[in-house]
Design a protein with these regions (language model features):
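Conserved ABC ATPase signature
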Residues: 128, 152-156, 160
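Catalytic Walker B motif of ABC-type/P-loop ATPase nucleotide-binding domains
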Residues: 177-181, 186
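A short, flexible loop at the N-terminus of ABC-type nucleotide-binding domains that lies
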Residues: 6-38, 43-47, 125-126
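Conserved ABC ATPase "signature" region
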Residues: 115, 130-148
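The feature captures the beta-strand-to-loop junction immediately N-terminal to the Walker
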Residues: 52-54
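Helix-to-loop junction immediately C-terminal to a conserved catalytic motif
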Residues: 67
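Conserved ABC transporter NBD signature motif
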Residues: 75-88, 93
Length: 194
């Protein structure tokens, strides 16, 4: 099975070091299954791109490799001139996975979930500054969830939860935002607006 990169909007040139560069990337799981084989592509900084493919084509595996969640068997990843480890350390990447592993019964408010996106920028004590709270509000507003900020995450529909996690990624202010199946469970009106 294959997947393709669809360039939707490009702003920079492909020769810049400020690209997402994947060269000959192969990911083989411990059970011997190769989920991604020899993937290579460049996406210029400032571009909007879509990874398109059928179920099982390796899209989620690629995102997990870009995030450093799973090791590659072979190949190289450069994110805006940084290794995956350094890009993560410098808060350059925000990620919304296909599905969140969350205890929906845990009593956490929507605004606190989005505030988690600021943890990398808030410093050691993780105290929210007024500018962090303003970014949280702006992110919730962008996804149409500001009116739900004081609701518990477990009270929301699947599409609303997805929008909250998108707001968390926006609050991170990463240079790269990876969205795995971003519109699963989201209504058509919301999908059209974002």
């Amino acid at each position: 099975m294959t997947c393709s990169i669809l360039m939707i909007e490009t702003h920079q040139n492909l020769n810049s070091q400020k690209n997402i560069i994947v060269e000959d990337l192969t990911v083989t799981y411990r059970n011997g299954h190769t989920a991604l084989r020899s993937a290579s592509f460049k996406i210029p900084e400032g571009s909007i791109a879509a990874l398109v493919g059928v179920n099982g084509a390796g899209k989620s595996t690629l995102f997990k490799a870009l995030m450093g969640f799973i090791p590659s068997s072979r190949g190289k990843i450069s994110l805006l001139g940084y290794s995956v480890k350094d890009a993560l350390k410098n808060n350059l990447i925000a990620y919304v996975p296909q599905s969140e592993e969350v205890d929906w019964d845990f009593p956490v408010l929507v605004k606190d979930v989005v505030l988690m996106g600021r943890y990398g920028k808030m410093g050691l004590m993780r105290r929210a500054r007024p500018e962090d709270l303003a970014i949280v509000n702006k992110s919730l507003e962008r996804v149409g969830m500001l009116d739900f900020e004081d609701r518990q995450i477990g009270e929301l529909s699947g599409g609303q939860r997805k929008r909250v996690f998108l707001a968390r990624a926006l609050a991170q202010e990463g240079k790269v935002i990876l969205l795995d199946e971003p519109f699963t469970g989201v209504d058509v009106k919301t999908e059209t607006n974002y």
